[in-house]
UniProtKB/Swiss-Prot annotation:
The helix-turn-helix (HTH) motif in the cytoplasmic domain of the N-terminus is involved in the formation of spirals to maintain the rigid rod shape. As this protein is anchored in the cytoplasmic membrane, the HTH motif may contribute to protein-protein interactions to form the RodZ helix, which is localized beneath the cytoplasmic membrane. The C-terminal domain may be critical for determination of the rod shape by probably interacting with enzymes required for synthesis of the peptidoglycan layer, including PBPs in the periplasm. It comes from Escherichia coli O139:H28 (strain E24377A / ETEC). It holds the Pfam family HTH_25. The gene is rodZ. It is found in: Cell inner membrane. Residues 1-111 are cytoplasmic. HAMAP family: RodZ (MF_02017). Cytoskeletal protein that is involved in cell-shape control through regulation of the length of the long axis. This is Cytoskeleton protein RodZ.
């Protein structure tokens, strides 16, 4: 009778009450139980009061109760029916893992962005290179074209220049061929005797028809007879070629160019006359005179040094850009594009 009454009494008690009674019989406090089970005092109190914390999973709660029962020497089989009521097993809700898929989509989007960025960068670099190459090629073609034109013009001018002296020297005029002794005599008297004879002025029209303008100037300078007649006998007579030479006067509009490398250039003056067009070699120099302003086209500005009116001309802007120099030098030496 006593055993059945005790069994009925144990069944009437809840799990928490049985654990509390067993703890009190062993003389343990809630603090001591919490320290031995490595739990909070509040968790031990909730177990003894048959409370199931909302933030605690049923699996952990059942484990705590079993550990508590072993500590106070209560068989676990006696607590199983009460555990089913106090801490029923609940199906845990497993949240779908979205972080991996989101990271994968983000990584894919970043990959497309990087690919597009590199594509744009390659396109920009390609366009820049193509633009530079076309500009460089156009400059080279322009230089080649100007050089070809200048060489063709120089060849045509040289052919014309060679044909003119041949025609004038080989043409036979009856007037000139009929009187060779007279022309020889007059030149002999002009160059060897201090006094000029009387027939010399009569020969001038024939000489003007044959000789060049420089020789005509020499003859006119040698015609004054009284001056030559008053020359002393001991003085040496000057040749007619030296008598016609005058001291050159420096032209204020002279254009001086010194070349440090091979360079093609073209120079024209205000009248449109082409003073020079062609290739100049290294260590060469060029002195040009004409009517200002001058128009210059220089294929390699870095290879030439220009002085105009005794002052150097600045070509640094063309050298920096490595372009064909096109400039105009006016009377005030202000180069303009």
């Amino acid at each position: 009778m006593n055993t059945e009454a005790t069994h009925d009494q144990n069944e009437a008690l809840t799990t928490g009450a049985r654990l509390r009674n067993a703890r009190e019989q062993l003389g343990l406090s809630q603090q001591a139980v919490a320290e031995r089970l490595c739990l909070k005092v509040s968790t031990v109190r909730d177990i003894e009061e048959d409370k199931a914390p909302a933030d605690l999973a049923s699996t952990f709660l059942r484990g705590y109760i079993r550990s508590y029962a072993r500590l106070v020497h209560i068989p676990e089989e006696e607590l199983l029916p009460g555990l089913e009521k106090q801490a029923p097993l609940r199906a845990a809700k497993v949240a779908p893992m979205q972080s991996f898929s989101l990271g994968k989509r983000r990584k894919k989007r970043d990959g497309w962005l990087m690919t597009f960025t590199w594509l744009v960068l390659f396109v920009v670099i390609g366009l820049s290179g193509a633009w530079w190459w076309q500009d460089h090629k156009a400059q080279q073609e322009e230089i080649t074209t100007m050089a070809d034109q200048s060489s063709a013009e120089l060849s045509s001018n040289s052919e014309q220049g060679q044909s003119v002296p041949l025609n004038t020297s080989t043409t036979t005029d009856p007037a000139t061929t009929s009187t060779p002794p007279a022309s020889v005599d007059t030149t002999a008297t002009n160059t060897q005797t201090p006094a000029v004879t009387a027939p010399a002025p009569a020969v001038d029209p024939q000489q003007n028809a044959v000789v060049s303008p420089s020789q005509a100037n020499v003859d006119t300078a040698a015609t004054p007879a009284p001056t030559a007649a008053t020359t002393p006998d001991g003085a040496a007579p000057l040749p007619t070629d030296q008598a016609g030479v005058t001291t050159p006067v420096a032209d204020p509009n002279a254009l001086v160019m010194n070349f440090t490398a091979d360079c093609w250039l073209e120079v024209t003056d205000a009248t449109g006359k082409r003073l020079f067009s062609g290739m100049q070699r290294k260590d060469g120099n060029l002195n040009l005179t004409g009517q200002a302003p001058y128009k210059l086209k220089i294929g390699a500005p870095a290879a030439v040094q220009i002085q105009y009116q005794g002052k150097p001309v600045d070509l640094s802007r063309f050298i920096r850009t490595n372009q064909v120099a096109r400039l105009t030098l006016n009377a005030e030496q202000s180069p303009a594009q």
